[in-house]
């Protein structure tokens, strides 16, 4: 069992908060926005090329934070044991693949392009729920998915306009380099698949193992540590020169901040999946790209044009339609649960 220490055992005011769908969604939104922005900052630092190390720091911070909370009596979760570790290891492995491919995609792609494939993940997860959990997708929900994809396509057109304008201002050789294949598409395609598998399989394993939020957070991160370190030693450059370039004061500070942000996203992602559904979790993740797009205008010099702004409005419209569709579905099935 895992829980947050809340005081007396009688009526627990925190119980309603811990099982609140809207609060879990808002918490997940805030933490995931902070996580994405800090990750984008880290991977865009000059000469930074040790993504696995960055992700290792994040998981290490999460693990240490949980252990401290447990010592202080504010958190309870299952101790690491062989049976649970064996059952949960595939989830942690998928988590490593998901967060690594996400960091590589953010490194090479603009946020609007990144959003397109995240929206495709929503559809994969929605129909994955149909296959694995007996769920259903209404025509109204499908309409919201299509609108979300449309908002991403419109954002991409805006991004392409900006790229074309930039290429036109460059010399012919540089323009050719701009037009060359972007490896970010490969990373995004891989991230799309691993994200869908992670969310669907984690939800199933949570039901089978009866993991609570802190259990999920602890096992996700502590099992990811050796995987991340092994991958880093295998594929990343650990020479003294490269370590010096990667571990500057700016990069270390940014990695610590991103590690703190990962504490929130690690807890809130499991919390959101438990009290809502994996489709709602993924849709909220896609809606996060809207404020992230706005932060990109401020921090990351994202394209500023009519199409970029239009995509934001279409995205919010799709979110409203999705919320109404979910409400109608619940009203049509009042006796379930």
UniProtKB/Swiss-Prot annotation:
Residues 38-51, 114-119, 166-180, 237-252, 301-304 are lumenal. It is a multi-pass membrane protein. GDP-alpha-D-mannose binds at residues 279-291. Glycans are attached at residues 119, 242, 246, 249. The chain crosses the membrane at residues 17-37, 52-72, 93-113, 120-140, 145-165, 181-201, 216-236, 253-273, 280-300, 305-325. GO terms for cellular component: cytoplasmic vesicle membrane; endoplasmic reticulum membrane; Golgi apparatus; Golgi membrane; mitochondrion. GO terms for molecular function: antiporter activity; GDP-mannose transmembrane transporter activity. Residues 1-16, 73-92, 141-144, 202-215, 274-279, 326-337 are cytoplasmic. Keywords: Cytoplasmic vesicle, Endoplasmic reticulum, Glycoprotein, Golgi apparatus, Membrane, Sugar transport, Transmembrane, Transmembrane helix, Transport. Changing residue 288 to A: Decreases transport activity and GDP-mannose-binding. Changing residue 285 to A/D: Decreases transport activity and GDP-mannose-binding. Residues 326-337 are annotated as: RET2-binding. It comes from the Eukaryota. One of its GO terms (biological process) is GDP-mannose transmembrane transport. Belongs to the TPT transporter family. SLC35D subfamily. Present with 31900 molecules/cell in log phase SD medium. Involved in the import of GDP-mannose from the cytoplasm into the Golgi lumen. Defective copy causes severe glycosylation defect and abnormal retention of soluble endoplasmic reticulum proteins. Involved in vanadate sensitivity. Homooligomer. This is GDP-mannose transporter 1.
